[in-house]
Amino acid sequence: QELYGDLYNLEATPAESTAYRLAKHDKARYPDIITAHEGGTPYYTNSSHLPVGYTEDVFAALDVQDKLQTLYTSGTVFHTFLGEKLPSWQSAAALVRKIAENYELPYYTLSPTYSICTEHGYLKGEQKTCPICGKTTEVYSRITGYYRPVQNWNAGKTQEYKERKEYNIGTSVLKHKGPLHPEAKPEQEPAVEEELCKNSTGKRKILFTRE
């Protein structure tokens, strides 16, 4: 930016299809290259996200991701993958607030899996058949930035979905208080030395401060 006068941003690419496509081509050209799901359908972990089977503890994942995602200047997100919707809007609000108060990453989602029956509509969680009529359903999950029926995903994203550990909010443990938490101790202000001068009226005026 200083050299050319142009503006640049650092962005986490979504890679809805390239996570599989590039891994497949790389594996064909370089058989020894490391990809996710060694020995099977290859894919790359999206952007700088954790491996999809890393942990069921959402706060353990956030502890790692918060250090990375705050380095981006645009286009980054942490997806809180849930097996099914939370029991109430109050539960969702409490989780959103806890993340906001204790982490600094700019954007996150609550992403439950759900199913749709053509006869009976919305079903929570992954239910491949309708418990009421027995018809085959469509299971929806967030492929990356948007929801789509899992049956329409490419082979790599389908494998990722199979290996994905969904976060268990009930057993997740927050191990620290972040800077915005109400009980967090405020950082001590640095000692400041004021540089003063007198203006034409004789009043003192602060020119600048320094530590």
Question: How would you name each of these model-derived features?
Answer:
Residues Q1-P186, E193-E211:
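Long, C-terminal-biased catalytic regions of enzyme "large/alpha" subunits
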